[in-house]
C-alpha cells in the first residue's frame, strides 16, 4: 500500500463518495482528514490478517462516518448514514466497530483540532455498537420464537396461497419497528424490546391462520396456562419467555393503537368475534383486527409497512430492517450462527468469565443433575443466550426487588436513628438526588446528552421505573450491610459509616448499574454512573465485593457483570488520571507524592449534592426537605464522618500532597507489600478520609488499609492472568518468577502503573523474565498469545503512556508501543529486580537445599506463594480445581459418620492418633499407582450449581465466577465464602 501513488488513495475515496451520493462539503473535508492522517490510518500492521483492500475500506468508512457525523452536529446539515457507508464499502458492523477504536486513537489529534476535544463522545460509536448488539439479539430471539410457534418455510406453502411464512415473519418484524418508533422505551433496553416482540408474537398467533402453527392448541407444550375458557395466551407466553404479564399487557395495548392508526382498522373484542384462530383460547382482554393478514389484503398491508419502514427504520445511523433480512451482513460468519455471539471487540461479560470451555460449552447453561438411568439418562441443557440472561435477571428484579418498599425499612430506620443524629432524612434525600442525576426526569436538558437520534431518550415513565428499582435495591443492601457491620463490631451506632457520603454514593451507583445491566440498556453504559455521581473508579472498587456478599439473591449473571466491572476498575480505570487512588497513595506512600503531583493525577474534590442538583438543573419540587447542617466540620476529601450530605467539598487537590510531603512512610513488612492482615477491617476504615487514623489500629492511616485491599486485588487478578498466559505459551515454569517480579514492582516501583494498564506490566514482566532465563521467547509470541486472552484490547500493547519533559522544562506525555516502553521505561526501572533473578536460578546452595520436601509427600503447588485464589487450578493439563469448603456445607459434613473422612477441618480420624500418621496415610493413598475408587460420588451433598460456579477457565477469564471469591481481600469470611 505504501508503494502506491498518493493520489490513488484519494481518488478511490472520491469515487466512493460519488457512489454514496455524499455532498461536496463532506467529501472535501473527508479527503482533507484522510490526507492529514493517512500515514497513521493506513499502517497495515494495525489490521492483522486483513488484506490491504479491506484495511483501506475500513479507513474510508471510518473517515466518512467521522466527518459526516461531526460536521452534521456542528453545522446541522444531513450527511451520509453509517449503514449507507458500510453497505457501500461492503463491510460488516462488527468489523467496523472492531477497528474503529484503534483508528480513532491514531487520528485523535487530527479530529480534535478540527472538531473539538469532545469529538469522540459525539461520534457515539460505543452506543451504536451496543445498539447493534441489542437489535441483533432481538432479531435472533424473534426468529427463534417465531420458528417454534409456526411452521418452517419448507412445509408451509399450500397450492394457490399467495402468502408464506417468510412474509409473516417479515410482517411481524416491520410491525415491531413501527411500534418501536412510537414507544421510546423500546429504544433503550433489551428487556423492553423482548416485551414488544412477545406482544407482536401474541398478535400473530391470534391473526395468522391456524394452519400455519407448528402445534395444536389442545395439549400444547407452548401454551400451558389454562383457564375455564381455554388457553390463557398472555400468561403462557410470559411463562415461556420470562416476561412480566403487566408489561406485556401494556405493550399489547400500544400495539393495538399502532395497528388502529396505521391500518385504519377498528379493534374489536376477540370474545365477540368467531374464528377458527380463536378456538380453545381464552379471549378475555384480547383484541382482534378483521382482515389484518387475510390473503386478499395481506400483501397490501405488508407493502404499507415496508414503505413506512423505509422512512422510519433508517432515520438513525442503522437500517433496522436489515437486522432481519440480512443478519449475515450485520455479523461475521463465526458470529452469525451462535445464539450468544460476540460483536466487535467487546466480549459479553458472562461468556468472557464462563468456566472451562474445554469441558463445559457454556457455564450459563441451566444447572442440572447428572444423567442417570433413573432419570432417563438424558437431560436437556438450556443454553443461556443474551436474551434469556436478560429476561432471567429482569425476573429476579421483578420478583425479589420490586416488591420491596421504596423507603427505608423499620430495621434500617432503627440503624439510621441510632446514629449520633437521625440520618433517615439525609439518606432519603441523597437517594433522590443521586438517582435523579443518573435517571433524569426533572432536569431541563433531559435526554440531550444521550444522543443516538432520540430526543426523548429518557422518557419519564421509564426513568421513574428504573429509579424505583435502584432505590429499593439500595435500601435492601444498605440494611444487610448495617446488620453485618453491627454484628461484627458489636455496636448499633454506625455513625462513621452511615454518615459517609462516598460510601452511600458508591452503594447507590452500584445499585443503579445493576438495574441498567439487568435491562441491557444501550444509552447509558458504564462508567456513566460514575460521571453522574461524582465518583471515581477507585471509589466504586471498594463496594463491589461487599455488595455481592450482602445481596445473597443476586443472580449469577449480575455477579459476573460486577466481576467484569471490577476487573476493568483494577486493570486500568483506577490508575487513570483523576482517580481517588492517588489521593490515598500520597498518604499511604508519601514518597510517591512528588510524581503524583507533577503528573497532575490527583482527583478533584467530590461534588456536593448541591453541586449535582445545580449541574442537573433538578427542580427542588418533589425532593425531600434539605437536612440541616448538624456537623461543624468535615474530614478532608468529603469522607470523614462528621459531614452532612449538603457539605461543599472545597479542599484543594494538592492539599493532601502538601500535608503529607513530610510524613514518614508507614512501616512495611519484610516482604514489602503486605497482604491484608487477618484482623477485620470495618467498612468505615475503607471509606474514611485517607488521613484519618484506622479505628482498628490507630498507628496507621485509613489510606493504608484502602491501598492494601486494592493492591491485594491487583495481585490476585495478575496471578490469574500470568498463569493463563504462561500456560498459553507453554512456559508454566515462568509463572512464579513473573508473579514475584510483578509483585515487587507493585510494591517498590508503584509509579510504573500510573496512567497505564496492568496487562502492560504483566507482558513486560513476562518478556523480562524470559530474557534473564535465556529462553527463546519473543515479544511477538507473547503478544500473539495475549491477543487470545478474553480481556485483550489492542491499545494495551499499541498505546502506552510515557512521560516526557519538553524544552521549557514542563512535563508532557506521549504514547508508544510496548517494545519502546519496555526499552525506554520498563528496563531502566526494573533492571535491578530482573538481574536478581539470574544468580538465584543457578546458585549452588539452592541445589543443595536442605529444606526440600519430605520424601513421599505429594508434589507441592507451583503457585504456593500466590495469594489465596479460589478456586485454584492444580493441573495445567486437566481441568482440576481445588476450592476451600463452603461454610454452608460445613455442618452437614461434621456429622459423626463423617469423622472418617480425610482432611476434615484437620481432625484426626481416630482418637488420640497423631496427625502425622493420618498425613502418612494420605500420602500413601495419593501415591499408590494402582489405587481404584469403587465408591460413587454423592451429588446430594454438593449441588451441581455450586460445583459449576466454582470452576474457572483454564485459559482465560476469572478463576471464579463469584467476584467475592476471586477478588475479595483476605478476610476470614471471604475465604470461607469462596
From Swiss-Prot:
Residues 385-585 are annotated as: Domain A. Residues 705-832 are annotated as: Domain B. GO terms for molecular function: RNA polymerase II transcription regulatory region sequence-specific DNA binding. SUPFAM superfamilies: Cyclin-like (SSF47954). It is found in: Nucleus. One of its GO terms (cellular component) is transcription regulator complex. Keywords: Cell cycle, Nucleus, Repressor, Transcription, Transcription regulation. Residues 958-971 have a biased composition (Low complexity). This is Retinoblastoma-related protein 2.
Amino acid at each position: 500500500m505504501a508503494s502506491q501513488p498518493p493520489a490513488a488513495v484519494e481518488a478511490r475515496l472520491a469515487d466512493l463518495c460519488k457512489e454514496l451520493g455524499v455532498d461536496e462539503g463532506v467529501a472535501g473535508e473527508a479527503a482533507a482528514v484522510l490526507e492529514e492522517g493517512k500515514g497513521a490510518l493506513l499502517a497495515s500492521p494495525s489490521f492483522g490478517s486483513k488484506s490491504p483492500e479491506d484495511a483501506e475500506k475500513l479507513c474510508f468508512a471510518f473517515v466518512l462516518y467521522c466527518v459526516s457525523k461531526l460536521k452534521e452536529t456542528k453545522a446541522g446539515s444531513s450527511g451520509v448514514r453509517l449503514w449507507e457507508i458500510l453497505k457501500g464499502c461492503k463491510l460488516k458492523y462488527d468489523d467496523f466497530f472492531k477497528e474503529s477504536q484503534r483508528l480513532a486513537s491514531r487520528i485523535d489529534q487530527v479530529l480534535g483540532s478540527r472538531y473539538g476535544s469532545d469529538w469522540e463522545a459525539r461520534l457515539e460509536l460505543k452506543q451504536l455498537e451496543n445498539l447493534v448488539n441489542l437489535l441483533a439479539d432481538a432479531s435472533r430471539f424473534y426468529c427463534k420464537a417465531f420458528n417454534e410457534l409456526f411452521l418452517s418455510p419448507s412445509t408451509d406453502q399450500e397450492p394457490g396461497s399467495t402468502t408464506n411464512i417468510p412474509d409473516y415473519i417479515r410482517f411481524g418484524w416491520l410491525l415491531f419497528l413501527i411500534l418501536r418508533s412510537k414507544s421510546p422505551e423500546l429504544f433503550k433496553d433489551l428487556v423492553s424490546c423482548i416485551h414488544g416482540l412477545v406482544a407482536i408474537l401474541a398478535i400473530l398467533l391470534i391473526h395468522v391462520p391456524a394452519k400455519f402453527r407448528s402445534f395444536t392448541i389442545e395439549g400444547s407444550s407452548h401454551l400451558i396456562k389454562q383457564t375455564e375458557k381455554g388457553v390463557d395466551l398472555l400468561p403462557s407466553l410470559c411463562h415461556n419467555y420470562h416476561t412480566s404479564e403487566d408489561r406485556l399487557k401494556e405493550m399489547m395495548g400500544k400495539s393495538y393503537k399502532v395497528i388502529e392508526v396505521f391500518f385504519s382498522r377498528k379493534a374489536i373484542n376477540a370474545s365477540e368475534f368467531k374464528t377458527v384462530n380463536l378456538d380453545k383460547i381464552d379471549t378475555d382482554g384480547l383484541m382482534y383486527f378483521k382482515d389484518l393478514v387475510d390473503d386478499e389484503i395481506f400483501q397490501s398491508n405488508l407493502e404499507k409497512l415496508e414503505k413506512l419502514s423505509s422512512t422510519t427504520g433508517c432515520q438513525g445511523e442503522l437500517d433496522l430492517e436489515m437486522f432481519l433480512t440480512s443478519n449475515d451482513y450485520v455479523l461475521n460468519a463465526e458470529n452469525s450462527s451462535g445464539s450468544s455471539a460476540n460483536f466487535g471487540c467487546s466480549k459479553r461479560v458472562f461468556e468472557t468469565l464462563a468456566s472451562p470451555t474445554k469441558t463445559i460449552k457454556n457455564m450459563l447453561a441451566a444447572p442440572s443433575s447428572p444423567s442417570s438411568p433413573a432419570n432417563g439418562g438424558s437431560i436437556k441443557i438450556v443454553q443461556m443466550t443474551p436474551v434469556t440472561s436478560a429476561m432471567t435477571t429482569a425476573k429476579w428484579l421483578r420478583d425479589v426487588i420490586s416488591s420491596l418498599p421504596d423507603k427505608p425499612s423499620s430495621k434500617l430506620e432503627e440503624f439510621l436513628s441510632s446514629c449520633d443524629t437521625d440520618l433517615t432524612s439525609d439518606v432519603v434525600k441523597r437517594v433522590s438526588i443521586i438517582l435523579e442525576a443518573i435517571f433524569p426526569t426533572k432536569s431541563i436538558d433531559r435526554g440531550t446528552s444521550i444522543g443516538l437520534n432520540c430526543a426523548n431518550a429518557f422518557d419519564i415513565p421509564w426513568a421513574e421505573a428504573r429509579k424505583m428499582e435502584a432505590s429499593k435495591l439500595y435500601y435492601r443492601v444498605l440494611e444487610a450491610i448495617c446488620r453485618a457491620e453491627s454484628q461484627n463490631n458489636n455496636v448499633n451506632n454506625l455513625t462513621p459509616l452511615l454518615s459517609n457520603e462516598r460510601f452511600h454514593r458508591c452503594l447507590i451507583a452500584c445499585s443503579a448499574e445493576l438495574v441498567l445491566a439487568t435491562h441491557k440498556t444501550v444509552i447509558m453504559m458504564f462508567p456513566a454512573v460514575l460521571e453522574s455521581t461524582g465518583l471515581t473508579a477507585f471509589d466504586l472498587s471498594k463496594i463491589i465485593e461487599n455488595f455481592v456478599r450482602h445481596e445473597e439473591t443476586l443472580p449469577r449473571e449480575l455477579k459476573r457483570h460486577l466481576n467484569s466491572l471490577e476487573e476493568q476498575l483494577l486493570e486500568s480505570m483506577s490508575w487513570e488520571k483523576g482517580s481517588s487512588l492517588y489521593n490515598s497513595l500520597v498518604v499511604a506512600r508519601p514518597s510517591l507524592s512528588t510524581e503524583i503531583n507533577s503528573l497532575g493525577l490527583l482527583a478533584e474534590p467530590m461534588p456536593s449534592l448541591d453541586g449535582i442538583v445545580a449541574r442537573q438543573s433538578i427542580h427542588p419540587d418533589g425532593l425531600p426537605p434539605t437536612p440541616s447542617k448538624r456537623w461543624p466540620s468535615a474530614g478532608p476529601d468529603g469522607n470523614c464522618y462528621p459531614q452532612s450530605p449538603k457539605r461543599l467539598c472545597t479542599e484543594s487537590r494538592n492539599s493532601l500532597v502538601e500535608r503529607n510531603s513530610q510524613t514518614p512512610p508507614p512501616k512495611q513488612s519484610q516482604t514489602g507489600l503486605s497482604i491484608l492482615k487477618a484482623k477485620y477491617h470495618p467498612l468505615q476504615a475503607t471509606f474514611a478520609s485517607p488521613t484519618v487514623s484506622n479505628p482498628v489500629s490507630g498507628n496507621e492511616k485509613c489510606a493504608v488499609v484502602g491501598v492494601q485491599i486494592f493492591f491485594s486485588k491487583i495481585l490476585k487478578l495478575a496471578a490469574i492472568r500470568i498463569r493463563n498466559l504462561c500456560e498459553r505459551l507453554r512456559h508454566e515454569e515462568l509463572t512464579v518468577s513473573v508473579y514475584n517480579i510483578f509483585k515487587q514492582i507493585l510494591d517498590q516501583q508503584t509509579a510504573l502503573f500510573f496512567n497505564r494498564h496492568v496487562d502492560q506490566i504483566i507482558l513486560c514482566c513476562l518478556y523480562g523474565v524470559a530474557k534473564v532465563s535465556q529462553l527463546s521467547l519473543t515479544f511477538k509470541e507473547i503478544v500473539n498469545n495475549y491477543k487470545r486472552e478474553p480481556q485483550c484490547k489492542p491499545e494495551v500493547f499499541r498505546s502506552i503512556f510515557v512521560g516526557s519533559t519538553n524544552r521549557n522544562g514542563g512535563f508532557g506525555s506521549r504514547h508508544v508501543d510496548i517494545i519502546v516502553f519496555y526499552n525506554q521505561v520498563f528496563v531502566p526501572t526494573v533492571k535491578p529486580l530482573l538481574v536478581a533473578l539470574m544468580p538465584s536460578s543457578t546458585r549452588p546452595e539452592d541445589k543443595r537445599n536442605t529444606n526440600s520436601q519430605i520424601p513421599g509427600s505429594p508434589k507441592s503447588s507451583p503457585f504456593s506463594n500466590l495469594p489465596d485464589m479460589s478456586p485454584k487450578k492444580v493441573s495445567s493439563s486437566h481441568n482440576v480445581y481445588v476450592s476451600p469448603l463452603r461454610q454452608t456445607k460445613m455442618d452437614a459434613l461434621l456429622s459423626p459418620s463423617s469423622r472418617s473422612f480425610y482432611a476434615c477441618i484437620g481432625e484426626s480420624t481416630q482418637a488420640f492418633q497423631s496427625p502425622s500418621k493420618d498425613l502418612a496415610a494420605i500420602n500413601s493413598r495419593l501415591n499408590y499407582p494402582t489405587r481404584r475408587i469403587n465408591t460413587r460420588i454423592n451429588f446430594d451433598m454438593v449441588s451441581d450449581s455450586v460445583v459449576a460456579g466454582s470452576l474457572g477457565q483454564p485459559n482465560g477469564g476469572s478463576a471464579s465466577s463469584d467476584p467475592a471469591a476471586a477478588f475479595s481481600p483476605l478476610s476470614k469470611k471471604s475465604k470461607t465464602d469462596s
